[in-house]
Amino acid sequence: MQDFETFLADHLPRAETFHPHYNDALASMLVGGGKRFRPRLLLGIVEAYEPLLVESAMHAALALELFHTYSLIHDDLPAMDDADLRRGHPTLHTRYGDALAILAGDALNTHAFEILAESPLRSDVRIELVRILARNGGTGGMVLGQAIDLHFEKRPLKLEQVIELHRNKTAKLIAASLEMGAVIVGLERESRKALYDFGIELGLLFQVQDDILDATQSPEEAGKPTGHDGDKNSFVTLLGLEGARAYADGLAESLEERFGSFDAPIREALEGLMRDYLFRHRD
């Protein structure tokens, strides 16, 4: 992913301004680490089928990272999770205040779509990428999931409701990453759907694993506050730690089976990523 890190560093959002902190606020969380999970999924699909398009696809990968970073900045705010640590660093609002953190998140959100619109891809592809990101990140996707999560804090949900919450809040943007890669390389609609559905299940596993890590890791190990999910509708809160681990095992085994049915180029491109993440809850 070194190529993506270089691309990111070369395309950090900036404005010509006399504001003393604005550009630092835009850039700090982007360069402050992170797994780059969503860009890696998208670029993995492109690398598998159309390696010559990888450079052009960097714009879409960056758009995903910008959008994801905006969501983290807002998620950390006092009105939401009220977190003071992210990726081992103080959260944006603790450094620059709530107002600038909100505005920085807003700027990264909108800049993601500017990056997509200006990418060196065909116009029909750009339009479809914008649609996928907006649909999965917005009204009926990530934003909806966050709204459900906040509204039902301290009010227990049923398992199917918790799944629906996290399908929206976490899984849809991960699924969108795979679908966007499929669109860039021109895969048929059936293959796009298979990758999207795989991404939904992968996103749910990712969330269960995060819930497990919240219950078992220290803030220093996780790089963010832990042990704060007791009032939230997490999988550990609902199923208990061992129940959540068993649920994660089931998802991981299902994903392994699905992954084996993909074409060889996809398996080869994403095998390392799957190996790193499918069973990380067992570490």
Please give the residue ranges for each predicted region:
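N-terminal amphipathic/basic leader segments beginning at the initiator methionine
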Residues: 1-13
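Charged C-terminal helix
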Residues: 280-283
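Mg2+-dependent prenyl diphosphate-binding active-site environment of isoprenoid biosynthetic enzymes
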Residues: 12, 16-278
